[in-house]
């Protein structure tokens, strides 16, 4: 599946948000790339909407075509389209692995899933965009538990808060999906209504 593989820090600086998570280069230079950063200009409504969509896409590592499909699905569901969209993005397996603290970044989580390190309800899943459901159980494969990424995850457990809709159990690093998240449980610097306004034109 296609995905953005360019320089993440440069993209973070352009969009004004740390897309990597703990990106020290971004923290040192949180202004747009260029010799002195882009001059401050009054942003048009369209530009703000487009930038918010790009922030969401690159935060979750989703290409435009797939992101559009997510929006269309969210728009068909009952409730607020923006809330539905974020819930869909959060329910991706790579994001769940990241949120559970088993990977430092979503990009790393995507790699771990693609390399076949996880079972969902006892079945191997190696598709990062796989959508989890309430009451799913996600396990690290037995032979993967002692590999370096999961050793590091155990050593650094607790450094990043785990959202209340997930639970990580014991040394086996089993992930329990208690529910799909409500908007208040999603800690992401996005104004999703701007994305809805962009696509609804």
From Swiss-Prot:
In this chain, the stretch annotated as Disordered covers 1-42
Q: Which domain of life is it from?
A: Bacteria
**Residue ranges annotated for the S4 RNA-binding domain, each copy included:** 91-157
Q: What's in the keyword line of the UniProt record?
A: Ribonucleoprotein, Ribosomal protein, RNA-binding, rRNA-binding
- CDD domains with a match to the protein in the record: S4 (cd00165)
Q: Which GO terms describe its molecular function?
A: rRNA binding; structural constituent of ribosome
Function according to Swiss-Prot or TrEMBL: One of the primary rRNA binding proteins, it binds directly to 16S rRNA where it nucleates assembly of the body of the 30S subunit.
Instruction: Report the family membership.
Output: Belongs to the universal ribosomal protein uS4 family.
Q: Return the protein name.
A: Small ribosomal subunit protein uS4
Which gene codes for it?
A: rpsD
